[in-house]
């Protein structure tokens, strides 16, 4: 069972103003946010969670660039998966079964996919998008 400091049910959220990724426990009757990462990422824009490896994946933007990174819930093993030619990634979704990550980039006006290990990156859609943002993966169950 995946846990953050003993918490098994939680909501993850990003705060771009505070440069942080946070969580709220749903295991208790009161809700207080706790910080997972702060200051190590510049303007986080989207988060998703992989329960298979217990990693948080997040997109972020900086001055003139952006990226897709991940880390374990215990704040270790922070790594950047995709950085080159990533500008303003504003949405991401994990394919837990296929071990892929999909993201939108409103700077490059594309939707891309890559493996969760940072390999096999490719563009899915590059024409006809003005400001792609949120993305949801509708995976078949079963």
List each language-model region with its residue ranges.
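Short coil turn/linker residues within repeat-based beta-strand modules
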Residues: 18, 28-31, 63, 75-77, ...
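Surface loop/turn motifs at the tips and blade-to-blade linkers of beta-strand repeat domains
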Residues: 4, 35-40, 81-85, 124-128
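Residue position within the beta-strands of beta-propeller blades
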Residues: 13-14, 57-59, 102-103
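Beta-rich catalytic cores
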Residues: 43, 64, 88, 107, ...
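Residue-level detector of Asp-centered blade-edge/turn motifs that repeat once per structural unit
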Residues: 5-7, 50-53, 95-98, 137-141
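Short loop/turn segments immediately following the C-termini of beta-strands
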Residues: 16, 52, 61, 106, ...
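Structural motif
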Residues: 18-25, 64-70, 109-113
């Amino acid at each position: 069972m995946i846990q953050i400091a003993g918490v098994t049910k939680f909501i993850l959220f990003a705060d771009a103003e505070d440069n942080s990724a946070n969580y709220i426990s749903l295991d208790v009757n009161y809700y207080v946010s706790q910080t997972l990462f702060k200051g190590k990422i510049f303007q986080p824009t989207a988060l998703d969670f992989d329960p298979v490896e217990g990693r948080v994946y997040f997109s972020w933007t900086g001055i003139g660039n952006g990226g897709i990174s991940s880390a374990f819930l215990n704040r270790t093993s922070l790594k950047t998966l995709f950085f080159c030619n990533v500008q303003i990634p504003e949405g991401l979704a994990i394919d837990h079964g296929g071990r892929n990550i999909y993201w939108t980039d409103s700077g490059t006006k594309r939707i891309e996919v890559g493996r969760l290990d940072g390999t096999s990156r490719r563009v899915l859609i590059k024409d006809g998008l003005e400001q792609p943002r949120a993305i949801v993966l509708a995976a078949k169950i079963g």
